[in-house]
Amino acid sequence: MKILAGPSSQLLASKVAKEIKCDLALVEFKKFPDGELYLRIADELDGEVLIIQSTVTNDDVISLLQLIDAASDCYVRIVVPYFGYARQDKQFKPGEPVSARVIAQSIDADEVFLINVHDTSTLDHFKLRTRRKAINLSAARIMGNHLRGMHFESPLVISPDEGAVQLVRDTAEAMKAEFDVLVKKRVSSEQVIIQPKNVAIDGKDVVIVDDMISTGGTMAGAIKLLRSQGAREVHVACIHPVLSQNARLLLYHSGVESIIATDTIERAESVISVAPLIKEGLQIR
């Protein structure tokens, strides 16, 4: 088997190659003046490939499809660490496409692995050659292990809403730390406050965990809130560091101590590699 690195996941693919002791094939990329993308697999393939490519941008989606086509004579295993368009997993308004389904059904492969996909219903949209189901891997444990090594003082792991509770619970378990969730509590007919559901935060180091940080607006509000309620330090951690627009500035302006993320999207904050997780996932047959 050879590993084909897409343009958005070159460093991660290199790490996976080392983890599984597999050759990394040379892939050439370029963009024409009119915006069209070109790629070429410059090495010979041996019948089985592992393509690793996050689909952060539209160009990334096209590059993934081009890689699949270029390797179509092989048994194709694909890892999409960050699966773009996953948030459009249903029709929210009449006339909208289910974009997650559109992208999933365009992927012609034998096996597909995603990492902490926005909604696991997306897995049902893949129509794989082998008739297998796409697999969703969770990076909660490796993120929790990394956070435990940061030696926080009285750590408390917080979910910014009910939607991230399972991820936060699993992360906290790996950290051997308490966890809680922010909830809205009505104190009068006109006033609603947001606070942790069960655990007092005064004097604790708080880590807010979510699957994704995009614009940073939700996280920024939570940081300010926890600071005002007596947290000693507030850190944020996520699987997918989209970090669009001025997200970093917004988070640091709100008082965050650090931004910690995995390399499903390769950013400066990507200090946790999912390469070992991918190695484990590939053993699932």
Report each predicted region and the residues it spans.
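PRPP-associated nucleotide enzymes
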Residues: 1-285
